[in-house]
């Protein structure tokens, strides 16, 4: 393995250990506590417009809460989820324990996964919800997700913005509090997505919500 590959693998292992340690107990109350400030998730999922019988992957699927919501809106979709935390996937599998449809959940690195790991050639939709702000090498996660799309597929992202339209004191307090949970909103998210869309001849839709509390984006890949 190259030096870069070794360093990346080491960083992934370290991040996995960090996430498992943080979520070993938090996962039991995660959905209850996060619903008050992880805004825009449900509307993003409703707008996924997954084709009938299409494939949907969530990168950083956590407890499976978003997957369950997506299943209610797109009952024929084939669901897949990856997370670097084994602890979170324990909760994800419990979320679907009594349901007829069970997604394929895998422990995987968001920066280095391929559709083949899930037995498919690509995904029609990929969702990254409040995960890029927790992935150290988040640009590579965007790269991997775009590469995993089917022709004409869509990558949907919702995450913390820069609160640019809100009072400075609110932004300062929020970002200091988020840092305690290893969350870092990405100030250059739009620029990175614009560059990626241009490179892949894809269309980018980007919007700010709630004074920049939430940034939401969709990259629509080129049809072959």
Show where each model-derived region lies:
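C-terminal lobe and adjacent flexible extensions of AdoMet/dcAdoMet transferase-like proteins
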Residues: 217-224
